[in-house]
């Protein structure tokens, strides 16, 4: 007869009318009983003959393709001009006095962040934008391009201008300026002619610098003043002779994809005085001088015909405008859906490429990408805005994978010990937190995103046209991409983007200037950065609490008025460092804080309501007596595991599920096991914070017997049959708890100390978890354990009771930094009337 739920509860001693613990509990350690119960609950036999269930409610297998939904109305979020101040360490020191070694080290990690992959695999540009939405190819292409353009404009990306140079917008950092003579200068190869490289020229020359500045630049160069200099610096807009007249002026010569046909004449693009011994036109097109507003340079009309058709359509704008988009202007319409109808809508489509305000030399950057991008909803609650997903998973795969640094995340108990208090809470929202942290330009060649341009993208995805790799002179090839779908999409997009359609239809390669989200290094760096800032804030306001996990920052203070003034001070401090906060998203929580999926109040911690609802839904949809795919079980265990510490039996209750996942077997829920779990998760108990105290109760065991020391009382007992030592120690701890009711127990067994009961026999683990819930353990060396003698059957010998103080842990999260004395020359910080006379320390 299968085991009923009531009987099972009784077996686990979850009901009050159980017999004496010393008799009942050791029985649960019996292997035979555990096997019989497992068989009764149908836990151990995978029914292979029934097909597996692959979906339970919203849970599908871990690798299932849950298709993201494309939204043609997505708004691209705006990115404020995020610029973290470079002298962040000095600013923090002005705020709080000398920084601790820990804080300084963490802030140095992100100014600038560095990234050293072992191997970087370069992918063709076609893979730049992932064809995630086959129904909305063109729309997705333009939305993604617009998103990337927005990021570039906000100073978050570099734009590759040529193999060795990149441009960007926003304020430059010092390491972006001394790249010329820093270690990053890659010696130009022989075919590039080393002589022309000018070491004195600064890495950045803003576009606004005109004439005189350039002349002085040239005088400094070791080539000396050249005859071309006057002619170049003083030429009016649109100067360089006959070639210039026929082209669209673009302020810089080299664009996204470098022409593969360039010979030895194109010398390192950004050194300001390079190639002065060459023709004026070519110098204007290639050297940095062309950034000045005095004369905008053109593409390389001279070598137009050596380019393969797709590598650099973008910049060859000579007598035949070989820009794919503009070529439609002179062609005959092939049908009513021909693209030339769109191109002829306006005369001025703007430049083929835009260039940043600053330009730097970079290590060699191929015309490739290293990761693909696509768009998804910003989050489940906000489907109007899009979010860019960057896939740099190549760095986490294979045997060349980068092992990302590990960092401490507080566990549930540490978090409760720290934050469970009677403070008022408020949480800050850092907008685009990852994009605050600058990356060293040397990392740019490893983190490239981009696209091959609209023509390639459409050609690759449409079945009827082929990518033509030979010369594409004929108009027929040009019109290969015309189709009704493309025409309709572009007409609709024209309303949104206007003449930007032209700009976005060109190939582009962008590298990250701030840390991207798709790299395992980023969470680590963000955690280091915010925890260092919180440490500084905690030392500046010792009677308050500031704590962060990634971009989630919470502030706590004794009263609401106090909290508001703290909020004002901290906000101003963070703004002065260049951090961007989102004031609309500041949440005031009162006395119960919502953080990391938990609700934390003075009573302890519970999971947030939406997680409780998810669990209820999961049990409603859970099928009985049907084998469930182990990948779906992973999802179920992930959800239940989060709330397990709040249940009676905790993680041990989920052990059968874990075992199945490890064996990659399907799992079948019997009605009793499902009812048991459901009951467990319907009544959640808060995890309370641990209190410091003195340990008065000690437990010890040998394989054959147990002993307790409760105050001056000693007790002992024997087991019916010898047990493994860990099991015996666990039983002794349970007896100590049930006999004395003490919340602090001394033990010399490390497994019991760890409070992880999943390695014990299943039934015993479940029962012990409930008996020992809320108990704290203190380690006592065996030699000093007063319960050692009773456990060996000797009651006559009394060891003196130890004075064992217990201090709850707050984990390795460097939460509380003791403030160093403030040097005398700093003005005394003015304290508002604090509700506390003494500095408050975390509990």
Curated annotation (Swiss-Prot):
Q: Which stretches does the entry tag as region Polymerase/reverse transcriptase domain (RT)?
A: 347-690
Q: Where is this region: Terminal protein domain (TP)?
A: 1-177
Q: Name one GO biological process term.
A: DNA replication
Is this entry keyworded ATP-binding? Answer: no
- Domain Reverse transcriptase intervals: 357-600
Question: Per its Swiss-Prot or TrEMBL record, what regulates the activity?
Answer: Activated by host HSP70 and HSP40 in vitro to be able to bind the epsilon loop of the pgRNA. Because deletion of the RNase H region renders the protein partly chaperone-independent, the chaperones may be needed indirectly to relieve occlusion of the RNA-binding site by this domain. Inhibited by several reverse-transcriptase inhibitors: Lamivudine, Adefovir and Entecavir.
Q: Which UniProt keywords apply?
A: DNA replication, DNA-binding, DNA-directed DNA polymerase, Endonuclease, Host-virus interaction, Hydrolase, Inhibition of host innate immune response by virus, Inhibition of host RLR pathway by virus, Magnesium, Metal-binding, Multifunctional enzyme, Nuclease, Nucleotidyltransferase, RNA-directed DNA polymerase, Transferase, Viral immunoevasion
Keyword Membrane assigned to the entry: answer is no
The record, for SUPFAM superfamilies, names:
DNA/RNA polymerases
Please write the reaction equations for the catalytic activity of this protein.
Answer: DNA(n) + a 2'-deoxyribonucleoside 5'-triphosphate = DNA(n+1) + diphosphate; Endonucleolytic cleavage to 5'-phosphomonoester
Site described as Priming of reverse-transcription by covalently linking the first nucleotide of the (-)DNA, located at 63
Q: Where is this region: Disordered?
A: 219-258, 297-316
List the Pfam families: DNA_pol_viral_C, DNA_pol_viral_N, RVT_1
Q: Which family does it belong to?
A: Belongs to the hepadnaviridae P protein family.
Tell me the function of this protein: Multifunctional enzyme that converts the viral RNA genome into dsDNA in viral cytoplasmic capsids. This enzyme displays a DNA polymerase activity that can copy either DNA or RNA templates, and a ribonuclease H (RNase H) activity that cleaves the RNA strand of RNA-DNA heteroduplexes in a partially processive 3'- to 5'-endonucleasic mode. Neo-synthesized pregenomic RNA (pgRNA) are encapsidated together with the P protein, and reverse-transcribed inside the nucleocapsid.
Q: What is this protein called?
A: Protein P
Question: What organism is the protein native to?
Answer: Hepatitis B virus genotype B1 (isolate Japan/Ry30/2002)
Q: Lineage of the native species?
A: Viruses, Riboviria, Pararnavirae, Artverviricota, Revtraviricetes
């Amino acid at each position: 007869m299968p085991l009923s739920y009531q009987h099972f509860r009784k077996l686990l001693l979850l009901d009050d009318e159980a017999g004496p613990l010393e008799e009942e509990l050791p029985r649960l350690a019996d292997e035979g009983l555990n096997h019989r119960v497992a068989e009764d609950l149908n836990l151990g036999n995978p029914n292979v003959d029934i097909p597996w269930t692959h979906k339970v409610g919203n849970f599908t297998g871990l690798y299932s393709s849950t298709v993201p939904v494309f939204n043609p109305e997505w708004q691209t979020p705006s990115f404020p001009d995020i610029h973290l101040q470079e002298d962040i360490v000095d600013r923090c020191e002005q705020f709080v006095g000398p920084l601790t070694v820990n804080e300084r080290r963490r802030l140095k990690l992100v100014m600038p962040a560095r990234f050293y992959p072992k191997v970087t695999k370069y992918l063709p540009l076609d893979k730049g934008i992932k064809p995630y939405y086959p129904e909305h190819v063109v729309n997705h292409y333009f939305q993604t391009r617009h998103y990337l353009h927005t990021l570039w404009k906000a100073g978050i990306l570099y734009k590759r201008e040529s193999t060795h140079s990149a441009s960007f917008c926003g304020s430059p950092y010092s390491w972006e300026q001394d790249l010329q003579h820093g270690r990053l200068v890659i010696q130009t190869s022989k075919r590039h002619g080393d002589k022309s490289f000018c070491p004195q020229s600064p890495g950045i020359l803003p576009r606004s610098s005109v004439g005189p500045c350039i002349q002085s630049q040239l005088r400094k160069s070791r080539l000396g003043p050249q005859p071309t200099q006057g002619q170049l610096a003083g030429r009016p807009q649109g100067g360089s002779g006959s070639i210039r007249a026929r082209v669209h002026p673009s302020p810089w010569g080299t664009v996204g994809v470098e022409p593969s046909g360039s010979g030895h004449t194109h010398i390192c693009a950004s050194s300001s005085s390079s190639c002065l011994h060459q023709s004026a036109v070519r110098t204007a097109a290639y050297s940095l001088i062309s950034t000045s507003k005095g004369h905008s340079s053109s593409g390389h009309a001279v070598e137009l015909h050596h380019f393969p058709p797709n590598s650099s359509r973008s910049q060859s704008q000579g007598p035949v405008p070989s820009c794919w988009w503009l070529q439609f202007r002179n062609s005959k319409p092939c049908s009513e859906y021909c693209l030339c109808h769109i191109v002829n809508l306006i005369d001025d489509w703007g430049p083929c490429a835009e260039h940043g305000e600053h330009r730097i030399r970079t290590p060699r950057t191929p015309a490739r990408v290293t990761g693909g991008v696509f768009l998804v909803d910003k989050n489940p609650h906000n489907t109007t805005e899009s979010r860019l997903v960057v896939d740099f998973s190549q760095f986490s795969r294979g045997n060349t994978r980068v092992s990302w640094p590990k960092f401490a995340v507080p566990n549930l108990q540490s978090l409760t010990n720290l934050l469970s208090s009677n403070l008022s809470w408020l949480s800050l929202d850092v907008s685009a937190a990852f994009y605050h942290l600058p990356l060293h330009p040397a990392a740019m060649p490893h983190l490239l995103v981009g696209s091959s341009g609209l023509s390639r993208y459409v050609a690759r995805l449409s079945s009827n046209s082929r990518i033509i790799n030979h010369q594409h002179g004929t108009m027929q090839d040009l019109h290969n991409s015309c189709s009704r779908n493309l025409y309709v999409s572009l007409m609709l997009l024209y309303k949104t983007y206007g003449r930007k359609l032209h700009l976005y239809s060109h190939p582009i390669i962008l590298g990250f200037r701030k840390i991207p989200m798709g790299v395992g290094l980023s969470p680590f760096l963000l955690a280091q950065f915010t925890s260092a800032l919180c440490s500084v804030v905690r030392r500046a306001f010792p009677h308050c609490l500031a704590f962060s996990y990634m971009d989630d920052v919470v502030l706590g203070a004794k009263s609401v008025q106090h909290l508001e003034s703290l909020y004002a001070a901290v906000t101003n401090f963070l703004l002065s460092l260049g951090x961007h906060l989102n004031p609309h998203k500041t949440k005031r929580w009162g006395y119960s804080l919502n953080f990391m999926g938990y609700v934390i109040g003075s009573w302890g911690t519970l999971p947030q309501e939406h997680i409780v609802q998810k669990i209820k839904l999961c049990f409603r949809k859970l099928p009985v007596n049907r084998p469930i795919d182990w990948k779906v079980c992973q999802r179920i265990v992930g959800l239940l595991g989060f709330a397990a510490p709040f249940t009676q039996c905790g993680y041990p209750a989920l052990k059968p599920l874990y075992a199945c996942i490890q064996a990659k077997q399907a799992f079948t829920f019997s009605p009793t096991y499902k009812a048991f779990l459901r009951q467990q998760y319907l009544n959640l108990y808060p995890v309370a914070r641990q209190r410091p105290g003195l340990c008065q109760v000690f437990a010890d065991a040998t394989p054959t017997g147990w002993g307790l020391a409760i105050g001056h009382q000693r007790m002992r007992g024997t087991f019916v049959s010898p047990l493994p030592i860990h099991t015996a120690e666990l039983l002794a701890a349970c007896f100590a708890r049930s006999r004395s009711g003490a919340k602090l127990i001394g033990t010399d067994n490390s497994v019991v100390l760890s409070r992880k009961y999943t390695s014990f026999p299943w039934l015993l683990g479940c029962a012990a978890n409930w008996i020992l819930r809320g108990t704290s353990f203190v380690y006592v060396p065996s030699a000093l354990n007063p319960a050692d003698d009773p456990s060996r059957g000797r009651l006559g010998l009394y060891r003196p009771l130890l004075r064992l103080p217990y201090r709850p842990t707050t984990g390795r999260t460097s939460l509380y930094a003791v403030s160093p004395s403030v040097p005398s020359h700093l003005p005394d910080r003015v304290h508002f009337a604090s509700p506390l006379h003494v500095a408050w320390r975390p509990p």
